[in-house]
């Protein structure tokens, strides 16, 4: 019995020391709560966390002090992480759209060297996700909370070629576009 308890503690400790995540503070607001004696002020923080290898999450936290609000938001973000398959480890597999409330976000995969073309909160999500080339546009609500939720909604809808092939009962090679690999003309002339 004691051995099993030690093993559990060891697992929990190992989980806490798991890969370190990068985090980005997106927004911080002063909030107030009206009580009988007046107003109590506090702070709300919005944080995006990711491993820059395809995992990302966001969280919000409220507290009387800024560092505590950021800590709470970071903890929530780590608990709510999602995994997104990236094409060539740098961009999205296909164009997608996400919605939340009055906010709509359109995300498009981009050729190598394009960079991250995204505004404010969306840029933080893509950087923490590890995307290097993407073009995105937010339409409607510019509220950072809505923009991040809409971006996450779109990312959850992404389908990797493997999952599409599995649904269709085909091979991954049949799904991906074919690229002709013809030898360069200079090599054939010399030979």
UniProtKB/Swiss-Prot annotation:
Coiled coil: none
Ranges for region Disordered: 155-191
Gene3D superfamilies documented for this protein: 3.30.160.20, 3.30.230.10
Database matches in SUPFAM superfamilies: dsRNA-binding domain-like, Ribosomal protein S5 domain 2-like
GO cellular component: small ribosomal subunit
Keyword field: Ribonucleoprotein, Ribosomal protein, RNA-binding, rRNA-binding
Pfam families: Ribosomal_S5, Ribosomal_S5_C
Biological process annotations from GO: translation
InterPro entries in the record: Ribosomal_Su5_D2-typ_SF, Ribosomal_uS5, Ribosomal_uS5_bac-type, Ribosomal_uS5_C, Ribosomal_uS5_N, Ribosomal_uS5_N_CS, Ribsml_uS5_D2-typ_fold_subgr
GO terms, molecular function: rRNA binding; structural constituent of ribosome
Biased composition (Low complexity): 181-191
Domain S5 DRBM intervals: 21-84
Family of this protein: Belongs to the universal ribosomal protein uS5 family.
Record's function text: With S4 and S12 plays an important role in translational accuracy. Located at the back of the 30S subunit body where it stabilizes the conformation of the head with respect to the body.
Domain notes from UniProt: The N-terminal domain interacts with the head of the 30S subunit; the C-terminal domain interacts with the body and contacts protein S4. The interaction surface between S4 and S5 is involved in control of translational fidelity.
Subunit note: Part of the 30S ribosomal subunit. Contacts proteins S4 and S8.
Record-given protein name: Small ribosomal subunit protein uS5
Organism: Roseobacter denitrificans (strain ATCC 33942 / OCh 114)
